[in-house]
Protein backbone atom coordinates (compact mmCIF):
# COMPACT_ATOMS: atom_id res chain seq x y z
CA UNK A 1 0.00 0.00 0.00
CA UNK A 2 2.84 2.37 0.88
CA UNK A 3 4.56 1.58 -2.42
CA UNK A 4 1.32 2.21 -4.34
CA UNK A 5 0.77 5.55 -2.59
CA UNK A 6 4.38 6.51 -3.29
CA UNK A 7 3.95 5.74 -6.99
CA UNK A 8 0.75 7.81 -7.09
CA UNK A 9 2.54 10.66 -5.33
CA UNK A 10 5.43 10.55 -7.81
CA UNK A 11 2.99 10.48 -10.74
CA UNK A 12 1.06 13.44 -9.34
CA UNK A 13 4.28 15.38 -8.78
CA UNK A 14 5.44 14.74 -12.38
CA UNK A 15 2.05 15.87 -13.69
CA UNK A 16 2.16 19.11 -11.68
CA UNK A 17 5.78 19.69 -12.70
CA UNK A 18 4.84 19.32 -16.37
CA UNK A 19 1.91 21.74 -15.97
CA UNK A 20 4.13 24.37 -14.37
CA UNK A 21 6.82 23.80 -17.00
CA UNK A 22 4.41 24.36 -19.89
CA UNK A 23 3.22 27.58 -18.23
CA UNK A 24 6.85 28.62 -17.80
CA UNK A 25 7.54 27.85 -21.44
CA UNK A 26 4.81 30.32 -22.39
CA UNK A 27 5.62 33.05 -19.86
CA UNK A 28 9.44 32.97 -19.99
CA UNK A 29 9.68 33.85 -23.70
CA UNK A 30 7.16 36.66 -23.22
CA UNK A 31 9.32 38.08 -20.42
CA UNK A 32 12.40 37.77 -22.63
CA UNK A 33 10.67 39.56 -25.50
CA UNK A 34 9.51 42.38 -23.24
CA UNK A 35 13.02 42.71 -21.82
CA UNK A 36 14.53 42.91 -25.29
CA UNK A 37 11.84 45.27 -26.51
CA UNK A 38 12.53 47.78 -23.73
CA UNK A 39 16.19 47.91 -24.74
CA UNK A 40 15.77 48.06 -28.50
CA UNK A 41 15.98 51.84 -28.76
CA UNK A 42 18.55 52.27 -26.01
CA UNK A 43 20.99 49.63 -27.20
CA UNK A 44 22.49 49.40 -30.67
CA UNK A 45 23.35 45.78 -29.90
CA UNK A 46 19.70 44.74 -30.30
CA UNK A 47 18.70 43.64 -33.78
CA UNK A 48 15.26 42.78 -35.12
CA UNK A 49 14.55 40.82 -38.30
CA UNK A 50 11.46 39.35 -39.87
CA UNK A 51 11.11 36.73 -42.57
CA UNK A 52 8.51 35.88 -45.19
CA UNK A 53 8.58 32.67 -47.16
CA UNK A 54 7.10 29.44 -48.43
CA UNK A 55 7.52 25.88 -47.19
CA UNK A 56 6.88 22.21 -47.84
CA UNK A 57 6.24 19.97 -44.83
CA UNK A 58 6.99 16.39 -45.87
CA UNK A 59 5.91 13.10 -44.30
CA UNK A 60 7.80 10.73 -46.57
CA UNK A 61 6.27 7.48 -45.27
CA UNK A 62 2.83 8.73 -46.36
CA UNK A 63 4.14 10.38 -49.54
CA UNK A 64 2.66 13.60 -48.15
CA UNK A 65 3.66 17.15 -49.11
CA UNK A 66 1.97 20.05 -47.31
CA UNK A 67 2.79 23.41 -48.88
CA UNK A 68 2.17 26.77 -47.28
CA UNK A 69 3.40 30.24 -46.34
CA UNK A 70 5.28 31.26 -43.22
CA UNK A 71 6.84 34.15 -41.40
CA UNK A 72 8.75 34.84 -38.24
CA UNK A 73 10.27 37.45 -35.97
CA UNK A 74 13.94 37.22 -34.94
CA UNK A 75 15.31 39.25 -32.03
CA UNK A 76 19.02 39.26 -31.14
CA UNK A 77 20.63 41.16 -28.29
CA UNK A 78 24.11 41.26 -26.77
CA UNK A 79 24.32 42.40 -23.15
CA UNK A 80 27.02 44.61 -21.67
CA UNK A 81 28.70 41.45 -20.32
CA UNK A 82 28.78 39.91 -23.84
CA UNK A 83 25.96 37.43 -23.29
CA UNK A 84 24.10 36.81 -26.53
CA UNK A 85 20.30 36.44 -26.30
CA UNK A 86 18.02 35.43 -29.14
CA UNK A 87 14.34 34.72 -29.71
CA UNK A 88 12.80 33.27 -32.88
CA UNK A 89 9.02 32.99 -33.24
CA UNK A 90 7.67 31.16 -36.30
CA UNK A 91 4.15 30.83 -37.68
CA UNK A 92 3.25 28.47 -40.54
CA UNK A 93 0.00 28.43 -42.52
CA UNK A 94 -0.55 25.13 -44.32
CA UNK A 95 -2.54 24.17 -47.40
CA UNK A 96 -3.49 20.81 -45.91
CA UNK A 97 -4.78 18.52 -48.66
CA UNK A 98 -3.56 15.12 -47.45
CA UNK A 99 -5.37 15.28 -44.07
CA UNK A 100 -2.98 12.96 -42.24
CA UNK A 101 -4.73 14.26 -39.14
CA UNK A 102 -8.43 14.62 -40.05
CA UNK A 103 -8.99 17.40 -37.48
CA UNK A 104 -5.76 19.30 -38.10
CA UNK A 105 -6.06 23.09 -37.90
CA UNK A 106 -3.82 24.27 -40.79
CA UNK A 107 -1.67 26.60 -38.70
CA UNK A 108 1.29 25.65 -36.53
CA UNK A 109 4.01 27.30 -34.51
CA UNK A 110 7.68 26.91 -33.70
CA UNK A 111 9.91 28.83 -31.29
CA UNK A 112 13.55 28.92 -30.26
CA UNK A 113 15.19 30.88 -27.44
CA UNK A 114 18.87 30.90 -26.56
CA UNK A 115 21.34 32.47 -24.15
CA UNK A 116 25.01 32.07 -25.07
CA UNK A 117 28.19 33.07 -23.27
CA UNK A 118 31.93 32.43 -23.31
CA UNK A 119 33.78 30.62 -20.53
CA UNK A 120 37.34 30.57 -21.83
CA UNK A 121 39.14 31.56 -25.04
CA UNK A 122 42.11 29.39 -26.00
CA UNK A 123 42.98 31.36 -29.15
CA UNK A 124 41.34 33.88 -31.51
CA UNK A 125 39.66 30.92 -33.26
CA UNK A 126 38.95 28.42 -30.44
CA UNK A 127 36.78 28.93 -27.37
CA UNK A 128 34.80 27.09 -24.69
CA UNK A 129 31.33 28.39 -23.94
CA UNK A 130 27.95 27.76 -22.35
CA UNK A 131 24.52 27.78 -23.94
CA UNK A 132 20.92 27.48 -22.72
CA UNK A 133 18.30 26.47 -25.30
CA UNK A 134 14.51 26.46 -25.01
CA UNK A 135 12.70 25.12 -28.06
CA UNK A 136 9.04 24.48 -28.73
CA UNK A 137 6.74 23.24 -31.46
CA UNK A 138 2.92 23.00 -31.64
CA UNK A 139 0.27 21.51 -33.92
CA UNK A 140 2.26 20.18 -36.89
CA UNK A 141 0.57 18.30 -39.71
CA UNK A 142 2.62 15.25 -38.64
CA UNK A 143 0.64 15.08 -35.35
CA UNK A 144 3.09 16.77 -33.00
CA UNK A 145 0.64 18.38 -30.58
CA UNK A 146 3.18 19.94 -28.21
CA UNK A 147 6.93 19.74 -27.85
CA UNK A 148 9.28 21.40 -25.37
CA UNK A 149 13.04 20.99 -25.02
CA UNK A 150 14.98 22.85 -22.32
CA UNK A 151 18.71 22.11 -22.36
CA UNK A 152 21.60 23.98 -20.72
CA UNK A 153 24.96 22.81 -22.02
CA UNK A 154 28.62 23.41 -22.83
CA UNK A 155 30.01 24.25 -26.26
CA UNK A 156 33.38 23.96 -27.98
CA UNK A 157 33.59 26.51 -30.78
CA UNK A 158 35.87 27.08 -33.74
CA UNK A 159 35.64 30.30 -35.77
CA UNK A 160 37.98 30.47 -38.75
CA UNK A 161 38.09 32.94 -41.60
CA UNK A 162 35.87 30.82 -43.84
CA UNK A 163 34.89 27.83 -41.68
CA UNK A 164 33.05 27.42 -38.40
CA UNK A 165 32.41 24.38 -36.21
CA UNK A 166 30.69 23.65 -32.92
CA UNK A 167 30.26 20.68 -30.59
CA UNK A 168 27.58 21.01 -27.92
CA UNK A 169 26.60 18.67 -25.06
CA UNK A 170 23.89 19.26 -22.50
CA UNK A 171 21.36 17.79 -20.09
CA UNK A 172 17.82 18.93 -19.48
CA UNK A 173 14.13 18.31 -20.02
CA UNK A 174 12.45 16.72 -23.06
CA UNK A 175 8.68 16.59 -23.64
CA UNK A 176 6.72 15.41 -26.68
CA UNK A 177 2.95 15.01 -26.87
CA UNK A 178 1.29 13.39 -29.89
CA UNK A 179 -2.05 14.73 -31.16
CA UNK A 180 -4.86 12.35 -30.13
CA UNK A 181 -6.82 11.94 -33.39
CA UNK A 182 -4.66 9.40 -35.24
CA UNK A 183 -3.58 7.42 -32.11
CA UNK A 184 -7.23 6.84 -31.11
CA UNK A 185 -7.76 4.94 -34.36
CA UNK A 186 -4.81 2.71 -33.39
CA UNK A 187 -5.99 1.72 -29.90
CA UNK A 188 -4.37 4.48 -27.82
CA UNK A 189 -6.27 6.44 -25.16
CA UNK A 190 -5.89 9.61 -23.11
CA UNK A 191 -2.74 9.35 -21.04
CA UNK A 192 -0.85 7.52 -23.77
CA UNK A 193 -0.02 10.58 -25.86
CA UNK A 194 2.71 12.31 -23.83
CA UNK A 195 6.31 11.42 -23.04
CA UNK A 196 8.50 13.51 -20.73
CA UNK A 197 12.00 12.68 -19.55
CA UNK A 198 15.22 14.01 -18.13
CA UNK A 199 17.50 13.65 -21.12
CA UNK A 200 20.89 14.36 -22.67
CA UNK A 201 21.71 15.96 -26.00
CA UNK A 202 24.77 16.12 -28.26
CA UNK A 203 25.04 18.35 -31.33
CA UNK A 204 27.71 18.89 -33.95
CA UNK A 205 27.70 21.52 -36.68
CA UNK A 206 30.02 22.81 -39.38
CA UNK A 207 29.70 25.91 -41.56
CA UNK A 208 31.55 27.09 -44.64
CA UNK A 209 31.61 30.49 -46.35
CA UNK A 210 31.65 29.44 -50.00
CA UNK A 211 31.90 33.09 -51.04
CA UNK A 212 31.68 36.34 -49.07
CA UNK A 213 27.91 36.25 -49.69
CA UNK A 214 27.06 32.53 -49.91
CA UNK A 215 27.24 30.44 -46.72
CA UNK A 216 26.19 26.89 -45.84
CA UNK A 217 25.79 25.10 -42.51
CA UNK A 218 25.21 21.44 -41.60
CA UNK A 219 24.18 20.18 -38.14
CA UNK A 220 23.18 16.89 -36.51
CA UNK A 221 21.69 16.55 -33.03
CA UNK A 222 20.39 13.70 -30.90
CA UNK A 223 18.38 13.51 -27.66
CA UNK A 224 18.61 10.45 -25.40
CA UNK A 225 17.10 9.58 -22.00
CA UNK A 226 20.08 7.42 -21.02
CA UNK A 227 18.43 4.15 -22.07
CA UNK A 228 17.00 4.90 -25.51
CA UNK A 229 17.20 7.65 -28.08
CA UNK A 230 14.27 10.08 -28.11
CA UNK A 231 14.81 12.13 -31.24
CA UNK A 232 17.36 12.71 -33.99
CA UNK A 233 17.47 15.87 -36.08
CA UNK A 234 19.49 16.90 -39.12
CA UNK A 235 19.61 20.50 -40.33
CA UNK A 236 20.92 22.21 -43.46
CA UNK A 237 20.89 25.93 -44.20
CA UNK A 238 22.19 28.00 -47.10
CA UNK A 239 22.07 31.79 -47.05
CA UNK A 240 22.87 34.42 -49.64
CA UNK A 241 23.42 38.02 -48.55
CA UNK A 242 21.40 40.61 -50.47
CA UNK A 243 22.98 43.80 -49.12
CA UNK A 244 22.60 45.32 -52.60
CA UNK A 245 18.85 45.29 -51.95
CA UNK A 246 18.81 46.14 -48.24
CA UNK A 247 21.69 46.00 -45.77
CA UNK A 248 21.41 42.94 -43.53
CA UNK A 249 18.91 41.10 -45.73
CA UNK A 250 19.40 37.60 -47.16
CA UNK A 251 17.75 34.70 -48.94
CA UNK A 252 17.62 31.60 -46.72
CA UNK A 253 17.04 27.95 -47.64
CA UNK A 254 16.49 25.80 -44.55
CA UNK A 255 15.88 22.04 -44.32
CA UNK A 256 15.10 20.24 -41.04
CA UNK A 257 14.62 16.46 -40.92
CA UNK A 258 13.40 14.98 -37.61
CA UNK A 259 13.14 11.34 -36.54
CA UNK A 260 11.05 10.37 -33.48
CA UNK A 261 11.38 7.20 -31.39
CA UNK A 262 7.75 6.09 -30.98
CA UNK A 263 8.70 3.05 -28.87
CA UNK A 264 8.36 5.26 -25.77
CA UNK A 265 4.58 5.34 -26.31
CA UNK A 266 4.15 1.56 -26.68
CA UNK A 267 1.35 -0.02 -24.60
CA UNK A 268 2.79 -3.51 -25.12
CA UNK A 269 6.08 -5.04 -26.21
CA UNK A 270 7.32 -3.53 -29.46
CA UNK A 271 8.22 -7.10 -30.48
CA UNK A 272 4.63 -8.29 -30.16
CA UNK A 273 3.01 -9.32 -33.48
CA UNK A 274 0.01 -7.17 -32.51
CA UNK A 275 2.06 -4.03 -31.78
CA UNK A 276 0.95 -0.86 -33.55
CA UNK A 277 3.06 2.29 -33.11
CA UNK A 278 1.15 5.34 -31.92
CA UNK A 279 1.56 6.83 -35.43
CA UNK A 280 2.02 5.16 -38.84
CA UNK A 281 5.01 7.45 -39.51
CA UNK A 282 8.02 8.36 -37.37
CA UNK A 283 9.71 11.25 -39.16
CA UNK A 284 9.01 14.55 -40.91
CA UNK A 285 10.93 17.09 -42.97
CA UNK A 286 10.51 20.85 -43.19
CA UNK A 287 11.83 22.57 -46.33
CA UNK A 288 11.65 26.35 -46.11
CA UNK A 289 12.68 29.20 -48.42
CA UNK A 290 12.55 32.69 -46.93
CA UNK A 291 13.61 36.29 -47.31
CA UNK A 292 15.16 37.67 -44.12
CA UNK A 293 14.81 41.44 -43.71
CA UNK A 294 16.07 43.74 -40.92
CA UNK A 295 13.31 45.56 -39.06
Region spans (language model):
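Residues that define the transmembrane beta-barrel architecture of outer-membrane proteins
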Residues: 63-71, 105-111, 144-152, 194-202, ...
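Hydrophobic alpha-helical segments and helix pairs
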Residues: 112-159
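Outer-membrane beta-barrel "beta-signal"
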Residues: 236-242, 279-295
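Hydrophobic, aromatic-enriched interface-forming segments
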Residues: 162-207
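Sequence/structural signature of outer-membrane beta-barrel proteins
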Residues: 55-61, 90-101, 120-122, 133-145, ...
Amino acid sequence: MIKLNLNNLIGSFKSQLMEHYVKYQILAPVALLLSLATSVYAEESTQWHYTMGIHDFIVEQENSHTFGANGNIIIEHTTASDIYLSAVLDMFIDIDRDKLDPDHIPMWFKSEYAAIGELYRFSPQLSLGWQVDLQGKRNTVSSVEKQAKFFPGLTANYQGQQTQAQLKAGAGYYFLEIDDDVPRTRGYDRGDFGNSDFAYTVMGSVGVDLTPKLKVNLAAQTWNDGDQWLENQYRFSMSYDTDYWEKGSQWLLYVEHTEYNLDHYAKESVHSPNYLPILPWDNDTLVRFSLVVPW
